Amino acid sequence: MIINIGELARVSDKSRSKAAGKLVEVVSIQLKHGVKDEDSEVKVRIIPKDGKSKPQFGYVRAKFLESAFLKAVPAKGIETIDTSHVGVDFKWKLGQAIKFIAPCEFNFIKDDGRVVYTRAMCGYITDQWVEDGVKLYNVVFLGTYKVIPESWIKHYSNALYA
């Protein structure tokens, strides 16, 4: 990642700095002859979560800085639509129980505390919207939720299974 003084960045959890995992502002960059740019020492100001705390500073290697703003990109095989017109018709209705199948396993915690891995799940649609041309649905199941694209939904489900 190319960084400039004054930019916002996130420090990777892999860093051993006290700024690891935090949002920071780049204060200065120390470049030395013979040292790779990625190994340059960067002074950062840790941005406090409450916005009021006294500023703290830390030092990290440039290779541990990540973009603070992530851009979602639709995965291959996900259908996209043209959103230039007003009003989008969603195939699956709000409040309905549906069954979806994810392309890879995800986990959820059962009532007894066990972690279970699955690809298929039933749940209720609680929200729907279009983002970057992809129709997305918020599906609630077993006390948690998952945002899924329309192509994962297979059919309406019996409410007993949701």
Curated annotation (Swiss-Prot):
InterPro entries: Tscrpt_reg_MotB
Pfam families named in the record: motB
MF GO annotations: double-stranded DNA binding; single-stranded DNA binding
UniProt keywords, alphabetically: Transcription, Transcription regulation
Subunit text: Monomer. Homodimer.
Described purpose of this protein according to its UniProt entry: Compacts the host nucleoid. Probably dysregulates hundreds of host genes including derepression of most of the H-NS regulon. Plays a role in the transcriptional regulation of middle promoters.
Protein name, per record: Transcription regulatory protein motB
